[in-house]
Each structure stands twice: as structure tokens, then as C-alpha cells.
């Protein structure tokens, strides 16, 4: 696509949403509680802030503000407000006066922000544990959230990933013609490295005329030792290994396809 000469600022909003899952098997209630505590500490608000700050660096965004919170009993959230251009400290108003209305803040966040929310959980009896991280990178202007794809998937040890990319709004060129997208894309997969694509089974559902792109990813290689918490495969019988493997694989298939699979 040839470069466009725009009339004013690029008003297109580009949003990339991730749903990333890490799956684990923890046999006892104590093990499940231990996994939840471990993953909650591993991906606390401070760690997530580091990941998102690096994401800002990768996509070329400037950080305006960071809000973070760890929750009880578990989970964390981080939201970073970003801009396309560097901010001059001399232009920042630090005087005492009422801030903007919440309506104004939300409108700004909807333009350029990066946020993450985490959701550790476990099955009450079956030994299955999942960690889900929801991430949204939403930018306006020439900044592209697609640059952060490989980094975010790698950082969050992803077994399963669902991604949505959409472009909204329009921008005008100097002749007044509206443009509803400013780059070529037919799949989110085109913005992934070959090494990353080799690791996953992938499936696309795209609505090209609406500038909506959806990709699902499921890790290809399954090694039981990577999915056990406080246990090793050698300590289990062959029957136990098969039972746990079947349980984990069924869980991963259900999450990947977004529907429950009946027991046969």
C-alpha cells in the first residue's frame, strides 16, 4: 500500500486483543492452591507493568500514566495510557484543580492504551488449573499494536491464544477522501515470526469488509512434564499419565474451540 498524505492527524484506531491461557495439572487441593499462589506472584502487577512497559517500547509509544492493582484473593490489573508523540514535561499541568470528568478519561483511554487483567482459577475437584491473561493494545495514529505480537505471546508462556485485531474510524487524505484502513492485512498470522508460527496450530476467522481479524492458536507439542505442578511424570503410573494427559488435552481442546466436549 502506497503512503498516504493525510489531512491532519491519523484518526484510525487499531485494537489488538489477546486472551492467553496457561494450563496446569495439580492433583491435590493444596497443590492447586500452591499453583494459584505461584502464578499470582509470577504475574503480579509489578511484573505485568514491566511487560507492558516493554510493549510500549516495542510499538514506539510514549507512556503518559500507569495504573496498577493486585487483587485479593488473586489476580492483577495494569493499564497504561500512551501517546504517539513524546510529552514535554513543561507542558504537563501540575496545578491543583479538578481533573477531567470520568467520561473524558474513558474516551482518551479508548484511543491509546495498553491494559492487562489476569484470572487464575482451578477446577474444584479435577486437578485442572488455568491462568488467563486478557490483554488489549489500542492505539491511534501511525503506531501499530501488531508489532508487539511475538513478544507478548512469548512472555506469557502461552498454551492457547485467541486474538482479535480490528481497525475503526477513518482518516482523510489531503483530497478529503476517507480511508478506513492504512495498511495491508489478510491475517494476523502475517505479523508473526516463522519460529512462532511453527510452534502452534492456528485457525483464522476474518471479516475483511469490516476490518475484523481473528486468529486462534494451540501449542503443537505436548510434554506432560511441562503441565504438572509439584509432580514428575516418572512418579506416576502409566495409567495415571494417560489419564492426566487425556484430561489436559480435553481441557485445551475445549478452550481452543470455545465449547465443552462431552465424555465418550
From Swiss-Prot:
Binds 1 pyruvoyl group covalently per subunit. Its cofactor is pyruvate. Is synthesized initially as an inactive proenzyme. Formation of the active enzyme involves a self-maturation process in which the active site pyruvoyl group is generated from an internal serine residue via an autocatalytic post-translational modification. Two non-identical subunits are generated from the proenzyme in this reaction, and the pyruvate is formed at the N-terminus of the alpha chain, which is derived from the carboxyl end of the proenzyme. Its EC number is 4.1.1.50. Keywords: Autocatalytic cleavage, Decarboxylase, Lyase, Polyamine biosynthesis, Pyruvate, S-adenosyl-L-methionine, Schiff base, Spermidine biosynthesis, Zymogen. GO terms for molecular function: adenosylmethionine decarboxylase activity. It holds the Pfam family AdoMet_dc. GO terms for biological process: spermidine biosynthetic process. The record marks 111-112 as: Cleavage (non-hydrolytic). Pathway: Amine and polyamine biosynthesis; S-adenosylmethioninamine biosynthesis; S-adenosylmethioninamine from S-adenosyl-L-methionine: step 1/1. GO terms for cellular component: cytosol. It catalyses: S-adenosyl-L-methionine + H(+) = S-adenosyl 3-(methylsulfanyl)propylamine + CO2. HAMAP family: AdoMetDC_2 (MF_00465). Catalyzes the decarboxylation of S-adenosylmethionine to S-adenosylmethioninamine (dcAdoMet), the propylamine donor required for the synthesis of the polyamines spermine and spermidine from the diamine putrescine. Heterooctamer of four alpha and four beta chains arranged as a tetramer of alpha/beta heterodimers. This is S-adenosylmethionine decarboxylase proenzyme. The lineage of its organism: Bacteria, Pseudomonadati, Pseudomonadota, Gammaproteobacteria, Enterobacterales.
Amino acid at each position: 500500500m502506497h503512503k498516504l498524505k493525510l489531512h491532519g492527524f491519523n484518526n484510525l484506531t487499531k485494537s489488538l486483543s489477546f486472551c492467553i491461557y496457561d494450563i496446569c495439572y495439580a492433583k491435590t487441593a493444596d497443590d492447586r492452591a500452591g499453583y494459584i499462589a505461584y502464578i499470582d506472584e509470577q504475574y503480579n502487577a509489578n511484573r505485568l507493568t514491566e511487560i507492558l512497559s516493554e510493549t510500549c517500547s516495542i510499538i514506539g509509544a510514549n507512556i503518559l500514566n500507569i495504573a496498577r492493582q493486585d487483587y485479593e484473593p488473586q489476580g492483577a490489573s495494569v493499564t497504561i495510557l500512551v501517546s504517539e508523540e513524546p510529552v514535554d514535561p513543561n507542558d504537563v499541568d501540575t496545578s491543583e484543580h479538578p481533573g477531567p470528568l470520568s467520561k473524558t478519561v474513558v474516551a482518551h483511554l479508548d484511543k491509546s492504551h495498553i491494559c492487562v487483567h489476569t484470572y487464575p482459577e482451578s477446577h474444584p475437584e479435577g486437578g485442572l488449573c488455568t491462568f488467563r491473561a486478557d490483554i488489549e493494545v489500542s492505539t491511534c495514529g501511525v503506531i501499530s499494536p501488531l508489532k508487539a505480537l511475538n513478544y507478548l505471546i512469548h512472555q506469557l508462556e502461552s498454551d492457547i491464544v485467541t486474538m482479535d485485531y480490528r481497525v475503526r474510524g477513518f482518516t482523510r487524505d489531503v483530497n478529503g477522501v476517507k480511508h478506513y484502513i492504512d495498511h495491508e492485512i489478510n491475517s494476523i498470522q502475517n505479523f508473526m515470526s516463522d519460529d512462532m508460527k511453527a510452534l502452534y496450530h492456528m485457525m483464522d476467522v476474518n471479516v475483511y469488509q469490516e476490518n475484523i481479524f481473528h486468529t486462534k492458536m494451540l501449542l503443537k507439542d505436548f510434554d506432560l512434564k511441562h503441565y504438572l505442578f509439584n509432580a514428575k511424570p516418572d512418579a506416576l503410573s502409566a495409567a495415571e499419565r494417560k489419564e492426566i494427559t487425556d484430561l489436559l488435552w480435553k481441557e485445551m481442546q475445549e478452550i481452543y474451540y470455545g465449547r465443552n466436549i462431552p465424555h465418550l
